[in-house]
Structure formats: structure tokens, C-alpha cells
Amino acid sequence: MLDKFLRDNLVHGEFSIGKFQFAFLDVLLTVCITGAAVMIRKAIFGISGNPGLEGGTEMLIFCVLDFVLALLMAVFVWKTTENRLKVVGVYSLAVIWPAIAGNSALNGGFEVVFAVILVALLCIIGVKKVYNMKTFWLLTIFASIFQIAQGDAPATKLTNYWPNIYTLFSETGYYNEYGYAGKLLVVGILLMVFYYISKKKEVKVTPELMVASGLFVSLFISAFYPFMNYRSGLLANVFGLLMFIQNKNKFYVPMAMCIISYVSYGYFYNGTIGVYFWMYALGLVVLMLDAGVYLYKQLQK
């Protein structure tokens, strides 16, 4: 009798909040993964040299925003897919994703605020179902501005431990010339891409197109814009996770971005790396090209 009650009401039981139905096992997984995410951040706080909570409330606020970000990503996925498994999956991945957890708990990175704003914008668009060129440009331009805002390398280096293309040549040589030229190059290419999109007579704006655009600009700017810091991959990690949830064949995008981001964290804190850093720069460029092709395909639909 008790076994049957537990099976029917807990293991196989379902609950409803409004239109959202979820199973007891979904709730159990969400609670457990949230607890694991908290413990991950607590462990990162204990790393030698990390001020953790002693550094003030700023780092704690960023860690709380990690969970807000994960919830917003789950809301966006629910509003665009209504797939319960994908909702639980994206939340679970986001709260324990190493690049996201490390950005806040290890680096105290302000970038999570940018990510929260962009995903909140996606949620508003998804809830109101206003997929049009105005909302597309709004998201794309904000993503571009937020990604550029992450550049804070010292004036004598073209990158702050982030594998952009300048690691292929010289991080310190001709930094004044490359600095100006790199900025003009990025702005010029972005304007050409935007001009091409604006001239298309018919563009079907979809959630997939919005995510593809956000991923492309975040990857492109982080790869070619000078003075990027070692935390510059957060937005690409977030958009990469959303793209993977939308298209399982893109599983390699968030995985590769997570590796690149964590290598950058390690390079910054250790001052050395076991593999040539320029190899990760090539990987970043390949991911950017792949994202560009995917964006082009979405524009043709």
C-alpha cells in the first residue's frame, strides 16, 4: 500500500503551477542540482587567494545572479519549447556550468549582469511573442555593446589572458596600432553584417535566430576585438547552452567555450599554461566561423 502510494504520488506524480506541469522527480533533481551548485561555489570560495565572502557582498551578489540567470534561461526555454525535460536540463546545466560558476565565485565578474539582462530580454520577447526585426536588432546591438564592454586589458597588452587573434602574433608588439586597427576592423565587419541583414526583404525571426545572433556577435567580438579580458567568454557560454538546448547537434559549442574560458581563468591566476595559448585562439575563431554559418542558415529560413 505504502509502496503504491509513493510510486503514484511521488515517483510518477505530477504537479501543476498554472500551465506548467512538472513531475516530482523533476523537482527533486532541481533541488539537488541547486544544492550541488551552492556547494560548488562554496568550494571555489575556499581556493587559496580567493577572498570569497570576506571580499564583501559583491561576489555573493554575483553568485546569486548565477541562479537568477539559470531561472531566466529556463523560462526562455519553456516559453519557446514547452518541453519540460529541456527546461530542467538548461537550468541544471546553467547552475553547475564551470565557466558560469567560476566567473562569479572565482573572478567576481560583472559579466553575469550583462548575461542576466540579455536573457531577461529574451524572456520578455518570448513571453510576449514579439519576434520581429525590432526585437532582433535590440538583442543583437545590446549583445554587441555588452561584449565590447568586457575589454579591460592594460594599455601595453592587446589581450588580458584571453585567446583572441592577437595571441597568434604578439600581445604587446604594436599595441597602439593594432589596438586602433582592431577596433575599426570589428566595427566595420559588424556594420557590413548588419547591413546585409537589414537589406534582406524577408527574415523570419525565430528564437533560434535570436540565439544564433547573440552567439555570433559575442564570439566574433571576443575573437577580434583588442583588450579582451580573461572573463570575456561568459556571454558565449550562455548563448552556447541555449543553442545546444535548441539544437542538440550543437553540443560542442558550449563544451568548447567552457574549456576556453576555464583555460583563460587558469592562465590568469597561474601565469602559465601547459598548451600553446594560440591553439585556443584558433579554436575560438573556428567556433566563430561555425556560429556565422549557423546564423546565415537561420537567416535563409
Regions found by a protein language model. Name each.
Residues 1-22, 29-46, 109, 142-166, ...:
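Transmembrane helical bundles and short interhelical boundary loops of multi-pass, membrane-embedded
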Residues 18, 25-29, 52-71, 87-91, ...:
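Loop-to-helix entry region of an early transmembrane alpha helix in multi-pass inner-membrane enzymes
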Residues 20, 107-111, 191-247:
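Membrane-water interface signatures at transmembrane helix termini and the short loops
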Residues 37-38, 144-223, 298-299:
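Aromatic/glycine/proline-enriched transmembrane-helix motif characteristic
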Residues 55-59, 92-112, 219-226:
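Aromatic- and kink-enriched transmembrane "portal" helix at the membrane-lumen/periplasm boundary
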Residues 68-99, 129-137, 203-209:
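Transmembrane-helix signature of polytopic, membrane-embedded enzymes
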Residues 75, 98-101, 113-129, 239-240:
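Specific aromatic-rich, kink-prone transmembrane helix
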Residues 115, 125-141, 213-215:
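Short hydrophobic alpha-helices at membrane interfaces in multi-pass membrane enzymes
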